[in-house]
């Protein structure tokens, strides 16, 4: 079976490698154009392109697939390459470009998407991050027959995965990438064997949208309960990274523990307001949060520095009870 693959980041690279290992013919790989990255802003190929070139696969990098859009020449060249590939099916994983109807209609067996959630929950661009941010304890991967909607197509295969209390986007991403790679191989092998692969319409209930993560969301609002702040710290790891400030210095937050005692329940400790430091020692920096809760920061990072355990961080940045994190207070 000939398969065209469309994807860009590391999540997609895992699936591409798994398809290669399974012996599928891949006459063409689509990925986003190279982007400047790193401190030197050097042009860098996507993880999918790097994998494809390492295996001698043909790669196309259109800026758009819209024949009537801003880059019609790119779209026309991609269309010619897709027609020449004569693939029976296209596999899509975190590609990053909208597929117009002509692309969806081109392969005889359509386009299959590897989506990192149990649809219809968390349709959209950031399903892993939003699941952690929302405090979900369970997620998974869905193989979906793509249609013109935003992750609205019929479901072919799905499998769940627990979200651990310590999971970050980085750790959950890697588990779901491996799970998605296994599921897409299962789906394609069933197709190739002529086996029945029932397409189930997504239910109307339980729909949630995982909007793209904006950098502006990274700033912590200390008026939120500690549990919700912790979920954001894990959801925004590795990017964009949850952050706060202290006396004008930006600090990223990577590790935490929920303090069991409430702020007002600590004997001998005066009432503190959200964002005020309760204590700072080798065990962490305890910060007052909303609803009388407290969060102990255990791994922090100054701009341009490394991630440090609280004890090491405090040796280079003096934090004391009563100081404020976040917006300055009068």
Swiss-Prot record:
<dbReference type="InterPro" id="IPR037022">
    <property type="entry name" value="Formyl_trans_C_sf"/>
</dbReference>
<dbReference type="GO" id="GO:0005829">
    <property type="term" value="C:cytosol"/>
</dbReference>
<dbReference type="InterPro" id="IPR005794">
    <property type="entry name" value="Fmt"/>
</dbReference>
<dbReference type="GO" id="GO:0004479">
    <property type="term" value="F:methionyl-tRNA formyltransferase activity"/>
</dbReference>
<dbReference type="InterPro" id="IPR044135">
    <property type="entry name" value="Met-tRNA-FMT_C"/>
</dbReference>
<comment type="function">
    <text>Attaches a formyl group to the free amino group of methionyl-tRNA(fMet). The formyl group appears to play a dual role in the initiator identity of N-formylmethionyl-tRNA by promoting its recognition by IF2 and preventing the misappropriation of this tRNA by the elongation apparatus.</text>
</comment>
<dbReference type="InterPro" id="IPR002376">
    <property type="entry name" value="Formyl_transf_N"/>
</dbReference>
<dbReference type="Pfam" id="PF02911">
    <property type="entry name" value="Formyl_trans_C"/>
</dbReference>
<dbReference type="InterPro" id="IPR001555">
    <property type="entry name" value="GART_AS"/>
</dbReference>
<dbReference type="InterPro" id="IPR036477">
    <property type="entry name" value="Formyl_transf_N_sf"/>
</dbReference>
<dbReference type="InterPro" id="IPR041711">
    <property type="entry name" value="Met-tRNA-FMT_N"/>
</dbReference>
<keyword id="KW-0648">Protein biosynthesis</keyword>
<keyword id="KW-0808">Transferase</keyword>
<dbReference type="Pfam" id="PF00551">
    <property type="entry name" value="Formyl_trans_N"/>
</dbReference>
<protein>
    <recommendedName>
        <fullName>Methionyl-tRNA formyltransferase</fullName>
        <ecNumber>2.1.2.9</ecNumber>
    </recommendedName>
</protein>
<comment type="similarity">
    <text>Belongs to the Fmt family.</text>
</comment>
<dbReference type="InterPro" id="IPR011034">
    <property type="entry name" value="Formyl_transferase-like_C_sf"/>
</dbReference>
<feature type="binding site">
    <location>
        <begin position="117"/>
        <end position="120"/>
    </location>
    <ligand>
        <name>(6S)-5,6,7,8-tetrahydrofolate</name>
    </ligand>
</feature>
<dbReference type="InterPro" id="IPR005793">
    <property type="entry name" value="Formyl_trans_C"/>
</dbReference>
